[in-house]
């Protein structure tokens, strides 16, 4: 079976425009650079066909008002392609309708420069890219991940042997998200908690910026990857919400969440980046991934799996997985919400875990075993026992139980519960524009000297 994208070396005419030389074989056609870029952009526009995103006149203006779309930008290939397509769409609307646009675009990046050891900062690279879409103005905001940490709501969380979660509030202390994640038992747990942070912060920024829609750059391959990863992590109940267009409510505001690149494979995304000459804007981690499976996260493993499928000509497997995942729905009965990730809990995970696991030790049968047991009991600190007795139970889902299950020692795991700290912006190009205007009105020493 052929790969999803094949770069052509022989001279052949594009099957679309019939004038330029074809450079890639995509799906069933051989296309030139311009036709391929137009083909990918058409896939996104198909997803954004709603009237609210078009240039509005008459009653439509009153019905939809000014639409604002938040684009979640990681700096990777998919989100970069999404930004380029939206930028070109706005530029086209601006030219065809004499300065009018169907919506305003707010780009938000969660700063992972230090966390993932990135090769560059968003605020240094992307202003140059945004300048390509003039006269369209696109807002670029870089948010600190520490915005998630509310020091007033920090709790120490422990899992009991019978899988119940206990928490106790701790004194407010200055701590960063990176420091909290260091307490995770493994990389997969840290990755899982980071996803919770990302989703929460993006929705909070969308509400604050008065955005009615949030768009993610997840392509079809990434969505299929997400389905497998969520299943492995015990978060199958949120698969539908994580991959399908849906509506979220935050601060009494309804926000539509969309995945416009859902019909495009990762190989096709990479081809777009190459042909549109966007490579210099791609932000990536400088940390080399381990070649040993046990040192990889769950998402790393599933990503490698789909890369192998693509390389061997089975890229369409991602389409099958993604379409199957779209058909999944959440159970109708809801007991409560998880106090860590906010997901609906449909059945008590501790009851189910107790039925399928054995946590009690074997019976003591010899005097030697009894002696060792008494020594163990004597080594337990009374302070620790009193501390555990003073903890309060909290509701957590099965996925969070798995994530926190490997926390070692009596220190527990520190996490903010039901808190909402102030959003901390590290960069806003709106502020940069305002500063430029102010600088134009600042008099220098020479300008201040007036001859009489």
From Swiss-Prot:
Coiled coil: none annotated. Keywords: Cytoplasm, tRNA processing. The keyword Cytoplasm applies. The keyword Repressor does not apply. One of its GO terms (biological process) is protein urmylation. Pathway: tRNA modification; 5-methoxycarbonylmethyl-2-thiouridine-tRNA biosynthesis. It comes from the Eukaryota. Gene3D superfamilies: HUPs (3.40.50.620). It is found in: Cytoplasm. GO terms for molecular function: nucleotidyltransferase activity; sulfurtransferase activity; tRNA binding. GO terms for cellular component: cytosol. PANTHER family: CYTOPLASMIC TRNA 2-THIOLATION PROTEIN 2. Belongs to the CTU2/NCS2 family. Plays a central role in 2-thiolation of mcm(5)S(2)U at tRNA wobble positions of tRNA(Lys), tRNA(Glu) and tRNA(Gln). May act by forming a heterodimer with NCS6 that ligates sulfur from thiocarboxylated URM1 onto the uridine of tRNAs at wobble position. Prior mcm(5) tRNA modification by the elongator complex is required for 2-thiolation. May also be involved in protein urmylation. HAMAP family: CTU2. This is Cytoplasmic tRNA 2-thiolation protein 2. It comes from Candida albicans (strain SC5314 / ATCC MYA-2876) (Yeast). The gene is NCS2.
